[in-house]
Amino acid sequence: MKILISPSKTQNKNIDSFSNNEENILFTNKTNELNDLLIKSINNEKFNSWLELKNNSLIEETIKDIKEFKNNKAYKAIEFYDGLQFKNILYSQLSETQKTKLNESLIIISGFYGIVFPNSYIKPYRLMLGSKINIPNYKNLYDFWFKEFNQKLEELNPDKLIINLASGEYSKLIDNSIFNVINVDFKLFKSNKYVSLSTFSKQCRGYFINQFLNINLDINKIKDLDILGFKFNNELSYKNNYIFTKAY
C-alpha cells in the first residue's frame, strides 16, 4: 500500500537536513531534462505564468534556482515542503518507527521529480504538474510523466492499493486502470451544503497521515479516524471514495 499526496509550493531552505547532492531520486535524467528546458524558457513571455510567479522577488529566486540547479543544496523532502499539509503531518513528533513507516509508505507526486519520498533529498524548484510549459514531443507534463510514473509506482506497490490524498491536479497522474485507489476527501457542511475548502483540506490531509500512522496503517480502521473534527460520512461516501465531514 502507498499513500499519495501533492507537493507544496511553499518550501523551506532554512533547515538543517540538507546535502550537497540529491538522494533517493528515481528519475534524475528526466528532472535534468526539465531543468534544461526551463533554462531555455526563461526569456519566454509566458515563463512567469507557467510557473505562477507573481512578484519580482519570487521571479528572481526561481530563475536563480534554475540556473544554479546543479550546484544548489538538496533538502530532505519531508522537512523542505512547508505547506499546511506537511506541517500537519507533525513529522518532528513522530516516533522513529513511525518515521520509518512514513518513508516506506508515503509518495509525494512531483511535476519536477516525478516521485519523491519523505527521505528524498531534493533541490528547490517551482514547476507544478499542471504547468502549461511546452515540452518537445509531449502534450504536457502529465504526458511527460505518465508512463514512467505508473510503471515505477507499480514496482514499488505490488499489492496495487493506494490511499489517495492528492489534489485533483496531481490525482490525474494516477492510472486508475492499474491500481485500487481509495480517494479520501474532507468536506464542511456550510450554508446547508457540503463544500471543500482548500485550507481545511490541506490541514486534514496532513493530519490524516499522522493519525493513519497512529493506527499502524491499518486500512480497516480508517473509517474510525477523527481528523481535526472531521469524521467518516457513510451517506456521502461511495465505493472507494471516503468522505469525512464536519459542520462549519
Curated annotation (Swiss-Prot):
Please list the disulfide bridges: none
One of the protein's GO biological processes: response to hydroperoxide
GO CC terms, sorted: cytosol
Q: Which InterPro entries match?
A: YaaA
Which Pfam families does the protein's record reference? H2O2_YaaD (PF03883)
As for family, the record states: Belongs to the UPF0246 family.
Q: What is the recorded name of this protein?
A: UPF0246 protein MYPE6270
The species this protein belongs to is Malacoplasma penetrans (strain HF-2)
